[in-house]
C-alpha cells in the first residue's frame, strides 16, 4: 500500500504531463487541498477525460480553469465542504479570536509511510502536514 509515485514539483518542470505519463493518460481523480491557483490548474491538466477534480482548498483569488478542456474532456469539478457557510464563517472567527487553536504537526515527507500507518490506526491527533521541502 502507499504511493506508487512521488513527483517533486521542484524537479519536474511539467507536473501534469508527468502524471499523465505515469497513469497512462491521466489520473482518474485529483483532490486539491492546496489554496494555490497553480494546484487547481495542474489538477485539471492531470486528470484523464471523464476524470474528476475535487476542490477542498479555499483559494483567496479567482480561479481561471480551462473551461474548454473541462467541457471537451468531460471533467467533473466539484467542491467539498462540510457544514454551512455560517459554520465556516464561525469556525474562521473562532480561529481568528484564538478560541480554537489548531494542533498541527509537521513531519518530513519521507516519513509518509509511518504517518499513513498512524492515520489507519487512528493515533493522530490534530492535523498532520507532510513537509515536501525536506526532499
At which residue positions do the language-model features occur?
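Adenosine-nucleotide cofactor-binding segment
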Residues: 1-42
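A local structural motif
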Residues: 26-27, 78, 98-103
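Helix-to-beta-strand junctions that scaffold the AdoMet/dcAdoMet cofactor pocket
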Residues: 47-49
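Short glycine-centered segments of the SAM/dcSAM-binding site in methyltransferase folds
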Residues: 51-53, 76
Amino acid at each position: 500500500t502507499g504511493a506508487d509515485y512521488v513527483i517533486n514539483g521542484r524537479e519536474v518542470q511539467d507536473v501534469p504531463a508527468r502524471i499523465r505519463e505515469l497513469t497512462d493518460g491521466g489520473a482518474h481523480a485529483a483532490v486539491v487541498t492546496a489554496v494555490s491557483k497553480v494546484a487547481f490548474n495542474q489538477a485539471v491538466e492531470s486528470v484523464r477525460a471523464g476524470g474528476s477534480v475535487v476542490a477542498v482548498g479555499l483559494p483567496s483569488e479567482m480561479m481561471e480553469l480551462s473551461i474548454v478542456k473541462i467541457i471537451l474532456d468531460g471533467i467533473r469539478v466539484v467542491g467539498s465542504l462540510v457544514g454551512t457557510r455560517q459554520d465556516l464563517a464561525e469556525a474562521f472567527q473562532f480561529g481568528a479570536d484564538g478560541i480554537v487553536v489548531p494542533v498541527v504537526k509537521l513531519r518530513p515527507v519521507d516519513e509518509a509511510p509511518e504517518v499513513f500507518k498512524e492515520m489507519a490506526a487512528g493515533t493522530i491527533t490534530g492535523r498532520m502536514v507532510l513537509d515536501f521541502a525536506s526532499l
